[in-house]
Regions:
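Charged, low-complexity intrinsically disordered terminal regions and linker tails
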Residues: 1-225
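Short, basic amphipathic alpha-helical segments that act as recognition/interaction helices
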Residues: 242-244, 248-280
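Generic hydrophobic/packing signal
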Residues: 204, 208-213, 217, 235-236, ...
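Aromatic-residue detector
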Residues: 86, 99, 114, 238-239, ...
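Short amphipathic alpha-helix starts
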Residues: 229-246
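Intrinsically disordered, low-complexity regulatory regions enriched in Ser/Pro/Gly/Thr
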Residues: 227-228, 252
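Generic alpha-helical structural element
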Residues: 179-182, 234, 249
Length: 280
């Protein structure tokens, strides 16, 4: 975003690049840490920049502290280069960073930031020195790598029946684990399911248990669907015919039912053995 370099904020902080990250940090420090009342406005707008400048002018002690903090507390952009711009990863990381830092930021400006920007803002606002932040971010990277490994638990969902399986999974969870689904949006595809479990608090063992039960429900449902398409018949075969049926089933590695099905359909198609009845 292009801004006027001669605005009040540039005058108040000469030599600063005043990137959106820095402007957001200044605003959030003043609002959240210093408890200075600020009027809501758009991120990095001239109105925001002027409000920050006036607040700093009224509080020179705060200004001096921020100048020192910028060089000792803000990690370089390169430290966050591994964080994706959007998607599951930055959302999970931001949630974890919120827990790690203990910061609960209610600012409307913070809510307008992307998940990645929120992650960076949390680290910027966290009252720790450069080295501690660097170590915490490195551990967070490792935690994400470990967390993402659990995606394998849900590989069963990835096929042509993905949406149907996800619908069944949501239905099962809603009925059997209402605590997890309360106030959550129903998921309809695998990516949404993964994001749901990112923030569910469920352990890998619990996830595996849930998937196993959902798979059983799926198998039961499929068995019932197939049963609707079939009808059971009970009939008596002579012992000699029964023996032949067993022999055919064994030779062709088929079930007795499958042998009968193939013979009947074959006769219908080729008319080799049953004589046609004369029409009346």
């Amino acid at each position: 975003m292009i801004v006027n370099e001669m605005d009040l904020l540039s005058d108040e902080l000469p030599g600063w690049g005043l990137t959106e990250r820095e402007v957001a940090w200044l605003w959030l420090v003043l609002e959240s840490r210093e408890r200075i009342q600020m009027d809501e406005c758009q991120l990095n707008s001239q109105t925001m920049r002027n409000q920050i400048a006036r607040a700093l002018r009224r509080n020179p002690r705060v200004t001096r502290g921020l100048v020192r903090a910028r060089d000792s507390e803000l990690l370089p952009e390169e430290a966050f280069s591994w964080v994706e711009k959007s998607g599951r990863q930055p959302k999970w990381l931001a949630a974890q960073a919120g827990n790690k830092t203990g910061l609960r930021i209610r600012s409307s400006v913070f809510r307008t930031l992307t998940d990645r920007e929120q992650l960076i803002a949390l680290f910027d606002l966290w009252d720790r020195d450069f080295g501690q932040k660097e170590s915490a971010l490195k551990r967070l990277s490792g935690a994400w790598t470990e967390h993402a490994r659990s995606d394998r638990i849900f590989s069963w969902f990835k096929d042509k029946d993905e949406r149907t399986k996800c619908a069944l999974a949501w239905s099962w969870l809603e009925k059997n684990k209402p605590r997890l689904t309360w106030r959550a949006e129903p998921f309809t595809k695998l990516t949404e399911l993964l994001e749901f479990f990112d923030h569910s608090g469920a352990s890998d063992e619990e996830k595996e248990l849930y998937v196993d039960k959902i798979k059983r429900r799926w198998s039961t449902q499929k068995t019932r669907e197939k049963a609707v398409e079939k009808k059971q018949y009970n009939f008596v075969l002579p012992l000699s015919v029964n023996a032949v049926l067993d022999k055919l089933a064994e030779e062709h590695q088929l079930s007795r039912t499958k042998v009968l099905e193939m013979l009947i359909l074959g006769e219908e198609q080729h008319e080799l053995y049953l004589p046609k009845q004369p029409s009346r």
